[in-house]
Amino acid sequence: AIDEAEDRERFDELLERCNIPRAPGRTVFNLDEALAAAEEIGLPVLMRPSYVLGGQNMIVAYNKADIIEYMGVITEHVDMDHPVLLDKYIMGTECEVDAICDGENFLIPGIMEQVERTGVHSGDSICVYPAQHLTQDEIDTMVDYTGRFARELHVTGLVNVQYAVSHGRVYVIEVNPRSSRTVPYISKVTGVPMVDMAVRCCLGEKLTDMGYGTGLHPNAPYVAVKVPVFSFEKLHAVDTQFGPEMKSTGEVLGIAPNYHDALLKGLIGAGYTFKTPGPGSCCIFTVKDSDKPCLLYTSPSPRDVDESRM
């Protein structure tokens, strides 16, 4: 199952059998193949080696220079017996699902939504349970796709699936037939003992006999926000830019009746400080050029943004 999820050709065959869409992608072994694939798919593209954890050696390439630099580094330091994976980068909302499977049925304790854009490693993104900005159709689609993966891969135990949602369509980013770093978080905030249940499934018990039901577990009556913690102030000469490679060294949890308060608790717990705004207060946004058009739609008062300084 692990090889089927990690090997690009076998994974594409799995998606075809399950009738599940994914971003266009190719496998490449050298620079010429990478440039040709990027031209065919269209920039930007997500590039990563096969069989990696923590987003190691992954980048989002926005131009040919990025591809040339990446392939030069990767072919020098990585075993090229396995190909480099090159996928179309989809800008959207990233979501994550951890599920327990007994070989027939599956249980999803909850769907998690990442605050940061797709392309930022999920371990470095603020994570929200339950998802705040998904439609019911998108939720139902994720539950359906997760069940198809669990059955087709014959998973007994835990499986992790990462999704990207763009313009109402759900795409699969990757499937990991194993435990993930979000299992302790989602177990704690939902009250579903995932590890205990997964072990019982491996020993032959059925989910229907464990008292938590199957499919998607009902949402808790509160919001839980996981905020990453970084150690940049202790590590010198470290690239602080977020991307597909994980850089956080810890995390904190904020729980409250609503999203706003849970997020505020989490940020304060992670060491951020906030001052109560007074008359004439302003907020300074530091945004790269390619993201500036989005700023007008995400700032609290778009009409108050000084576009002359953009």
Where are the regions that the model predicts?
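ATP-dependent carboxylate activation and anion-phosphoryl transfer catalytic cores
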Residues: 1-5, 9, 14-18, 41-44, ...
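A short, GP-enriched loop/loop-strand-helix hinge that lies immediately N-terminal to
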Residues: 1-5, 21-26, 299
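Short acidic-hydrophobic, aromatic-tinged amphipathic segments that line or gate anion-handling sites
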Residues: 26-29, 61
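Short acidic active-site motifs
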Residues: 33
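Conserved small/polar residues in nucleotide/adenosyl-binding loops
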Residues: 297-304
